[in-house]
UniProtKB/Swiss-Prot annotation:
A Pfam family matched in the record: SyrA
Location (main, coarse): membrane
Protein function: Inhibition of exopolysaccharide synthesis (EPS) and nodulation ability (NOD).
Gene Ontology biological-process entries: polysaccharide biosynthetic process
Transmembrane segments annotated in the record for this chain: 6-26, 35-55
Taxonomic classification: Bacteria, Pseudomonadati, Pseudomonadota, Alphaproteobacteria, Hyphomicrobiales
Name of this protein: Exopolysaccharide production repressor protein
UniProt superkingdom: Bacteria
Keyword field: Cell membrane, Exopolysaccharide synthesis, Membrane, Nodulation, Plasmid, Transmembrane, Transmembrane helix
């Protein structure tokens, strides 16, 4: 879910919703209230979708590495002259 694309899409959907609501009701006040409510519902849906993606990623990572995590995960990064393999095994950024 790429945030700028989502914002542009959300504004387009809200504009279409506002136009349709105005033609159906003929009231600017009612259109504004309903469009604001629609915007809040879209934001709640976006938040829940991002929360689901984070949960799913955490679940998949737990399945891939069922072993015990070290007590101090930054221990190998503190040692001089060593490259942490943990940094190399990171997945690519999902927004690209």
């Amino acid at each position: 879910m790429f945030a700028p694309r989502f914002v542009v899409s959300m504004l387009g959907a809200l504009a279409a919703f506002a136009i349709a609501t105005y033609f159906l009701t003929g009231s600017i006040a009612s259109t504004a209230v309903q469009t604001l409510l629609c915007a809040v519902l879209i934001q709640v849906g976006y938040f829940l979708a991002v929360l689901f993606l984070v949960w799913k990623e955490a679940r998949d990572r737990r399945k891939l590495s069922p072993g015990q995590l070290p007590a101090d995960p930054t221990n190998d990064e503190k040692q001089t002259g060593k490259l942490s393999l943990r940094r190399l095994n990171r997945p690519p950024h999902f927004n690209s």
